[in-house]
Amino acid sequence: MKRILTFVLALSMALSLAACGGKADDNKGKTEVTMTAQEIMDTLKEKLGDSFGCDVAETEDNISGYWGLDMGQVESWASMSNSNSAVNSSYAVIVKVKDGYAQDAAALLQTGYEQILSYSRMYNMDLQKVLQARLFVNGNYAVLLILGAQGDWEASDEVQAKFAAEEAAKVDEAWRGIFGSADNGITIPEEDVSNNGGFFDMTDDEGKNDPVLGG
């Protein structure tokens, strides 16, 4: 009788452990986060160190103006860039929004990103880092991250691209440490070589290649 009871107890414990293991697997990559946007920004800054790259806090006007976000839908936000933005494109925008607005916020971040990318392509400025941008949507958080240490601008495109990818992997790791997953939703539009991304029309009315502002 004792043997039977011992066997039953052992079997019950084994089944319980298996069930717990199943729950752990189901929740893998689905970490519940309640941090504010600023707390997430501070965590990224701490984790990334020199690979963070941002040193200037942006204003709310920038969030609602340049990025076009509806502040009535935003519960908390944080945004930083680099003080030498002419040559360093590091940027981080984090918003925690109300239910149902995360995808809309992500679409606006994508639009703003495309303008940054056009500028980088035009001047070949920090381009490889910009091409490694991250757009994350986790629950009610929407985030655009263009982060990474500065590479060697005199290196070949291949070397710069490799370095930027390695830096972006650090961003993924830091984000995964907070949310459990790092699924990048950024879309990289094809380069429009006909008009330099829409900033300038490089031909005048006679078809010459003299720069003309505005288009």
Language-model features: where?
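Sec-dependent signal peptide recognition
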Residues: 2-10
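Soluble, non-membrane globular domain cores that form compact, hydrophobic packing
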Residues: 21-91, 97-215
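C-terminal motif of bacterial Sec signal peptides marking the signal peptidase cleavage site
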Residues: 15-19
